Amino acid sequence: MQYPAATAEGLSGPLSGAYTLPAFKFQPRRESIDWRRISAVDVDRVARELDVATLQENIAGVTFCNLDGEVCNHCRQPVDPVLLKVLRLAQLIIEYLLHCQDCLSASVAQLEARLQASLGQQQRGQQELGRQADELKGVREESRRRRKMISTLQQLLLQTSAHSYHTCHLCDKTFMNATFLRGHIQRRHAGMADVGKQKQEQPLGEVLEELRAKLKWTQGELEAQREAERQRQVQELEMARQREMEAKKKFDEWKEKERSKLYGEIDKLKQLFWDEFKTVANQNSTLEEKLKALQSYSMTESHLGSLRDEESEERLKHAQEVQALQEKMEVQKTEWKRKMKALHEERAAERRQLQEENERLHVSLSQDQKKAAAQSQRHINALRAQLQEQARLIESQEETIQTLSLRKVEEVQEMPKAVATEEDSSEEELEASLEERQEQRKVLAALRKNPTWLKQFRPILEDTLEEKLEGLGIKRDTKGISAQTVRRLEPLLRTQREQIARSFREFPSLREKLNKEVSSRVKQRWESTTQPDGQPPVKSQRVTLATREVRPKTRTLTVALPSKPAEPSTPTLQGHSSHGPGLTQVSTPIPRPRVHGPSSTPVSPGSGLSSTPPFSSEEEPEGDVVQRVSLQPPKVLPRSAAKPEDNWGWSDSETSEESAQPPGKGSGGLASSGTLVQSIVKNLEKQLETPAKKPSGGVNMFLRPNAALQRASTPARKSQLSEDESDVEISSLEDLSQDLGQKGKPKPLSHSKLPEKFDVSPWSSGSRPRIPGW
């Protein structure tokens, strides 16, 4: 028992000062061991899993059981005494350890109670310390306030009078009366009383002089301090001004650098756009040449009597190539748009970055720098406005180029959709010309010098036109518009014209002036081109043919194209028939030789016979073919010679139709019924819409136009001609004057040999061309 006692002494050693250990005594063991419960315990599992709960359950039964009467179950012999001694020793150790555990638990509980008490005492001490700190702070404030009060009272005492107080000459204390002063001197300055008396005997003047000297010295010190402070402030201001000047200089340098960088980027963008534009123009010209080559290759020649094409596969191949080229052009346009969008986004990002940098610099600058920054900002805004003005100028020039290209390629007899779009383009042209007339003249001069630019701009103009048509509600693949669509678009177009007219007050007078100018020019040119032998000029058929043949590169194709019907020579043939040989009408016309003789009876263009036979052999010489198509000056009838020159030399059928109309609606009344262009278009439509009788042996080599398309285009055309404010008339006057100037010089055919299959009779209904809409 010495070892447990030593252990208990060692354990209770640190806690002996805190409390005393209770008395310990081993308990007697009378209970028997529960072998069934012990056998149910898995010792290996308890050791492996650290099952403390199982140990707590069995600790009491193992510690306080009696093992003296236990015997072996097999041999019925008592337990080995040595083993029994070991077991009893283990029981005693466990009991002692339980006692130590209880003591330690009690000690921990006691220490926790003491810790809680100490924490409470510490909290109370902190509260008391805070309260005392507050009291100390209040006492200090009170002391400071009383000190100020005492100093104020002393100053008041000094300021009241020199005889109302008594100052100690040995210290700086002051007293109310002499008794207090004497007591003070006797208490504090007993050994210096004699010296004090001598000082008191000094005259008051010396004291005043001394005080004045002190006052002057103090004032000098104050002046010196003020001067030093003033010098320091001046130096600080000078340094600040120098810093501001340096910052302003740096800002100006940065601004110049940014401006030069911006100008360089603008120049690069301009050069890039110009290169892209040249590339697009070259590609467009190349593609158009390829397209024309394919179209020329796609021409096929059908033998007489054969109604099917001999090269359908080749034509299909060419059509596929054309479609592939168009798709390639669309892909290129998409790529260009994407590049433009990326460039705009990059420009916007750079602009935002510059604005952020500018704002940051504005915040860091002083007042003078802010003024300079505001001035630079105004300059930047002015430059930006100039850039925007240049962009608007470029857009207006592009619109002018588009309208000019539309003016060069427009047809007299086009679809209503193209008419409506060209009206919008002409309105934009008028607005741009009123704003930028000088730049427009330069563009016109450049276009006159290089007409091939119009061919290069055509795809771009087509895209712009299609976008505008889509904006008006007309789809991209529409071949024509109905009368209902025309009626729906008329109010919109009329409203747009009214808005433009309100914005330009001088529009009516300018329109009237241009109308008179063009009318006089056309009349002068018409009179100047009159034949010298007194014969009247060529009829409207010649004008129509010249108008058709002047533009073989734009809307219409040559006569040799089989896939798209070209402009026929029907008006010319009809002109020949109206003034050709005297032939009587028969029920069944037969082919006759081309014999010209005097006419005895005038025949109208609609019902007369042509001098050209409906069929021609393939062995005809080239000279005969050209002779059939070329214009011949007709012989004038006696009643047509009596007409004045103001009738402009129209055909007999037109003269009869105009004489039947009421006054003011013919082609001679330009001031009341409309412009000259409307009269010419009406006469051309009358000539083309005149029905013709087809012979029994004739073969129609052209596709018949769609009747629904004709019915749809008729009201739209009438609506176009009824609008006096249509800008199509203004855009086509210059081309019309040029066409009238070339009326006597028809453009030769594009091929040396004209296919005989196109030498058809004038009564064929397929002679009217089909004008495709964009």
Curated annotation (Swiss-Prot):
Main subcellular location of this protein, as a coarse class: cytoplasm
Gene Ontology molecular function, alphabetical: zinc ion binding
Native source species: Mus musculus
Compositional bias segments (type: Acidic residues): 421-433
Compositional bias ranges of the Low complexity kind: 597-616
Assigned GO CC terms: axoneme; centriole; ciliary basal body; cytosol; intercellular bridge; mitotic spindle; nucleoplasm
Annotated localization: Cytoplasm, Cytoskeleton, Cilium basal body; Cytoplasm, Cytoskeleton, Microtubule organizing center, Centrosome, Centriole
Name of this protein: Cilium assembly protein DZIP1L
Chain segments carrying region Disordered: 415-435, 515-674, 686-774
Domain of life assignment: Eukaryota
Keyword annotations from UniProtKB, A to Z: Cell projection, Cilium, Coiled coil, Cytoplasm, Cytoskeleton, Metal-binding, Phosphoprotein, Zinc, Zinc-finger
Phosphoprotein found in the keyword field: yes
Composition bias type Basic and acidic residues, residue spans: 515-526
Purpose: Involved in primary cilium formation. Probably acts as a transition zone protein required for localization of PKD1/PC1 and PKD2/PC2 to the ciliary membrane.
A Pfam family: Dzip-like_N
Entry-annotated residues carrying Phosphoserine: S425, S426
